UniProtKB/Swiss-Prot annotation:
Protein's name in the database: Putative ATP-dependent RNA helicase BoYb
GO molecular function list: ATP binding; ATP hydrolysis activity; nucleic acid binding; RNA helicase activity
Biological function: Involved in primary piRNA biogenesis in germline cells.
EC number(s) on file: 3.6.4.13
Region (Disordered): 756-787
Organism, scientific name: Drosophila melanogaster (Fruit fly)
Amino acid sequence: MIKISDEKTWQSSRDSVYEVGDSYSGQNANRPLVATNCSEYAVAHANCQLRPVRRFAEVSLLPDILETMRNLGLNRLLRLQSYTWPHLAGGSGHGAMIVGSPASGRTFAYIPPVCHAVSRALMDFTGQCEDVEHDISQPDRYGPIALILVPDLRRVHQVSAMCLALLRKAHKNDSVTLALNVSSTKSSQFFLKLLNGVGCLVATPAQLVWFWQEAPGLMRFPCLQFLVYDDVDLMSREQLQDVQQVLQEILPLSHSPQVVMVSKSYCHTLMSKLRAVNDKPALVFGDILEAALYGGTRIRISIMRSEAKANAVVQMLQQCSPEEFRTVIFCSDDGDMQCLVAALEVQHYSCLPYYQTADLEVRQQVHSWQARSNGVILLCTDNCPELDIRDAHTIIHHSMSHSWSKFKLRHLKISDNLCNMVKPTASIVKKPLYSLVLLDDNNHRQLPRLVDFLQLHQKVDHRLVEVAKRIRQELGKARNDQHQLCDQILVLGKCYDPVCESRHRLSHIDRRPDYLPASGDVKVQLVKVYSPTHFCVRLLEHLPPKGTWRMMEYSAVQEFRMQLTQIKEPRRYWPPVAGAICMYHTTFTKERVRVLKVAAIKNTNIVQSDLTVKLQALDVDTRIFSTNCGKLFECPEALQQEAPLACDLRLPGWVPYFGERSWTEENIRNVNLILTQLPKDHFLQAKILFVAAGTLFVQDLVAIMYADQFKAHVRHLSLARRLVEATLVKRSENAAEMIREFFAEVIIEDDIDENVQDSKEKANSKPHEKMKGKMTDQPAKLQSQPPLSGRCLRLANMAHESVKENQLHQELQERRYETPEIPHQSNESDIPQSNEDRFSQLYECIMNCASLQLEDESKPAKHPDHVLSESVEFHKIMTNEDATPDHTQEKTALLLLPNNVARPSVTYYQTMTTLEFQVFLPEDDHDYKALLLGAQLFFRAISKSSDLILQFIMTLRFPYSSMSHNIRGRTVYISVKKLLALIDPLAFREYRFLKPNHDLFDKVDKQLQETQNRLVRFLEDMNYVKRNFEGQEKRETSEDEEVNVEGIERPDCHKIWDL
């Protein structure tokens, strides 16, 4: 691990030469090198003689740069750097292609010599300014001395910090910018700095194209000495073509800088371009396996049983005779080697096994074999670094290595026989080079990675690819992690990061969960903006295809119910298992999370608190974060069954406008500002394209408002259009297609499930229609229908009696109209004529309820509204059973409303004198009526713009005297006055559309408690009662604890106080 010894001093002396808004970061300057990727060996080819340095003291760099590197802890000279540093310091024409694994020191293989050349050029420029009056604005001083192109913004900041760290002490002129990034805000300061002179300009290909388009006439790079393509394999062909066109415009025709290319894999096309501009190119490999493939080695893979591996070795030896091809066979250990030697000697092959107990005599035999093999086969293991063999022709991997780096290092045995393709007169390989990999049941897990590597260089048999895919799926299920999908795949359809640790394959967890709709439109509530095309939302309503809007469960009520289900003193969750749901506790919050990844657990019987786990939030948002398992607690089983409150929403096919692979923080802030400054009465709506990996992939996110003048909904904002206008995104059909192809497997499975469900619903629709017909033809026989529950039976009886009473009243009124007595006529004229309409509407409402209940009982037990059913069961548990009459113990069937009839969203709370209801209407164009008849409360609201009817009827089991109501906006406030100033037990569990308003319950509860506390203190102060200090302490402590616990229902909410 690399450390900074003087970090405080450097951060305190922050320079203004860095881009405005960016500060020097020590973390970016020192990136730790991964030991397994840093090879002690390298393969270097060139058309000139390479003179590698052996020790750090032999490095010829400026003293300031060497001192800075020592302060950074870069005291170790890697083999890769020992070739590149002296070669790049050779001057013009000395280009290089560096091929190595990420985090293997390949970036520092070019940065020190580049910074050395920049410092020398700046010192020469300063000397000229001191000796002669030199105009800084001369055209020959425009532009940078070194141009470094990197694939993404993250690498821009990392490479810039490295260059600035090495250049900070080399030059003190404030007029020249040492390290410059392309500004993401298109500021004019960037062009001014570029005109005044720049040491190192670090940019992405898209940024280079952008600032050339902004000022094509001003951009000239006459002083450019180095042109570096870092991670050139991660740049697309279109990006490289655009860069080439820009460079042809900004570089003089007579000037050709030193070109350096850094790549993970070798590419013949890029090497040809390098040789075209530099006459002394060098090709340096830090990855030995890449060097083997470059040099003409043919790799074969065979999968078989362990018993058949010896026969496969014999067949390979028959094809490539050891008499002509020097052969090395790798085994796992000495025992494996003994068995193979015995099998080969039976076939009359001469073997030279090199065991771990080999003595000097065996070493002498190996030296003789290196001079002349004479058909003898050398057998060894990976634990023999003293075998200095470089001229083998055939390598047979009888057993695979324990690590990927050791497997690649095996091919060092054929490095001297690799063809040098850099030389114009490269000799053709006389003997082909082979590498045979034998896999069995014990080492088949290495196949997926080996297949991925070979697919980059050669065609692989499709059967091997399928086997590798199955093995990868099995390993993913067995592994104790459920990594999130790679973000680049979800945005671009492909991952370009070679060291990405996210998941890049589909898994069973990517199928659409039941709580997310598969198609249609949704109304959502915005929770958080992750990027211009990635959001965290909560679902409010769903519009199925050819259906009507359906309310999703109210998130606030669901969240409160989940808090009630939590255990007050939960147990620690151990051992954590990937995919499990648990509780994450902090100082002030508790939330549900899903475990994604768990570090290795040595002993599950020993509970650890510092074990690292990766989690994903489920309710607050969908963020992914890491913590220690000491903050994890068990989650109740009922709470684990609850659907998550939050989900991800993405706009597929929209990519960064300038060709980047990610957005800046400023872009995210701008999008967040757009979505948070919408008008008050808006709602967000999106059309679902498909659902996968817990994410809604939608066509667009639009903000819709209701226009009173037109009496219609209008679109206020289209997010995709706004982002295009702000030059934040652009449409990429290729990315959209790749994303859909990536999820094709789970999308097809969801379509099949949806078709099956639709066929079941159509099969069940005929009995429902028959039920409706019976209810319409015989409304008077509702009392004798056996399927009616207690509640609907009471409503039907009441409606029947009301109709009879209304008929008798009409007959009496007609008779009185026929009599000539004027007084009677005037009295009857005072009776409101609206009673007839009121009772007819009441009768219609009750008939709808009864019809819907009969229709519901004929449906299957399982239906899409399972969340509502679960909430009823939960409410039964939380409600006091003694306060409910016996007939409410009967199971109430779930009512499925017709298309034009729906239950409104209603909340309630009570004070000491009233029972308060709040009815939420979807639009403000509803005409409503509310009526209190005895113990029955009726409500009905009819929309003016559609045939939608919102209604409910409920029975109050507490004596109430009168009712008042009013409407404000889209909310109807109903207040029912009590006859007695007591607390109603509120046995409302059979009314599923009613939701308690817990915030106001707590407020009333707190006021009553404060009143009671004041009364107790008053009685104690007046010495009417004995002061109880101990009880007071306990009471105050419990009050403080309740105040600190937010969102948890108090146990006194529904109790009756005796005052």
